[in-house]
Amino acid sequence: MNETYRGGNKLILGIVLGVITFWLFAQSLVNVVPNLQQSFGADMGTISIAVSLTALFSGMFVVGAGGLADKIGRVKMTNIGLLLSIIGSALIIITNLPALLILGRVIQGVSAACIMPSTLAIMKTYYEGAERQRALSYWSIGSWGGSGICSLFGGAVATTMGWRWIFIFSIIVAVLSMLLIKGTPETKSEVTNTHKFDVAGLIVLVVMLLSLNVVITKGAALGYTSLWFFGLIAIVIVAFFIFLKVEKKVDNPLIDFKLFENKPYTGATISNFLLNGVAGTLIVANTFVQQGLGYTALQAGYLSITYLIMVLLMIRVGEKLLQKMGSKRPMLLGTFIVVIGIALISLVFLPGIFYVISCVVGYLCFGLGLGIYATPSTDTAISNAPLDKVGVASGIYKMASSLGGAFGVAISGAVYAGAVASTSIHTGAMIALWVNVLMGIMAFIAILFAIPNDDKRVKDAK
């Protein structure tokens, strides 16, 4: 590590561009599923798997990639991630073979796993105090803002230029990111780690999470009383206990459970998982207004514009609140406003224009709350991690983001489909949205009990 080097705006821009290769471009496929079906001649199931694989593989590999970044260098790992992003995007656009689409999406997931913890660790190393909080705000703008606009962006590009241009733009952005990061001094963990990579832990984790994903997304199709369903449940449970046993025995665990002895880190990570899980709100609300109210995909996207605007505006506000009052109060405030927003979006029984108003205000609260929450949460997580474990700690934190989003969408979609089939489309949407309200309440409770009231950083600033 270069002791005298301090990061500037050029490095921040390079990192943010790297971050949006996942949050904006890779996630944009959620709104171009019909286009993909037509281009690849594939059924809905195949395309759904391809769309979800990136977030899932990102979540599964992000911790291991964070640990590897600590060992081989975070700048090097970021560049590897950007190169993988280019390869994944190229595989998706060069042919009409579904197998290459799926492979490209898997590679994009591994790319995101390399980029996210490495860039967070670079920011912790080369920025300090208020400058670090500012840098993290822009990182959050890349991730939360990218996820906020990805649906509208994907639909707009696919409609005007063709869906492949999403990934052509992604390749260009990845190259720009590499050029901007070039010249940044390498940073590694100060403690030399001679232990072998936890391959066994990674294999068990992959088996467990893939099985759990199938249980959630395909449970109804398999039949909740079928042998396949119970077999998968058994695999998830057995794999979970094997994973715990393996992680306690190995010298270099994939997930270092000692990090969770730090309550603020635990609270930030759990609440981050749950508040990424409420992304299920978007898929339920968008599907409902199209199926239940006859909106087009573009009209549905317009309803959520207030979400995008507020999340981008409020991230810097969250940073300022963090500096003035510590992390707990803005995290609680943000989460509370998110819950109010989802509750307003869930008022599907309101007539016509009244529901539109409720939805627009709800999305506004949704974005406002997430924007306030983002920077205090991220700063709490990495500030409470030991310097030699910051890559692994960042990896676990971002694993919570990816898996929260992946499973939140999967759970909301499954609840919506099941509830609509057994009741009505309005009741089904309301039930699925209240599942997201419940996740928000659980996040609030995690913050309330795990994040301390006294923040030493605020006292130090005074």
What is the predicted function of each stretch?
Residues 67-200:
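Helix-loop-helix hairpins in multi-pass membrane proteins, especially solute transporters
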Residues 32-60, 298-302:
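Extracellular/periplasmic helix-loop-helix junction of adjacent transmembrane segments
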Residues 44-45, 129-139, 297, 387-396:
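Loop-to-transmembrane helix entry/capping segments in MFS-fold secondary transporters
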Residues 52-66, 116-120, 305-317:
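Central cavity-lining transmembrane alpha-helices of secondary-active solute carriers
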Residues 23, 27, 93, 109-117, ...:
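Small-residue-rich segments within alpha-helical transmembrane domains of MFS-like 12-TM solute carriers
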Residues 15, 22-23, 51-54, 58, ...:
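Structural signature of transmembrane alpha-helices in multi-pass secondary transporters
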Residues 159-271, 303:
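Hydrophobic transmembrane-helix bundles of small-molecule transporters
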Residues 10-21, 29-31, 161, 227-229, ...:
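12-transmembrane solute porter fold
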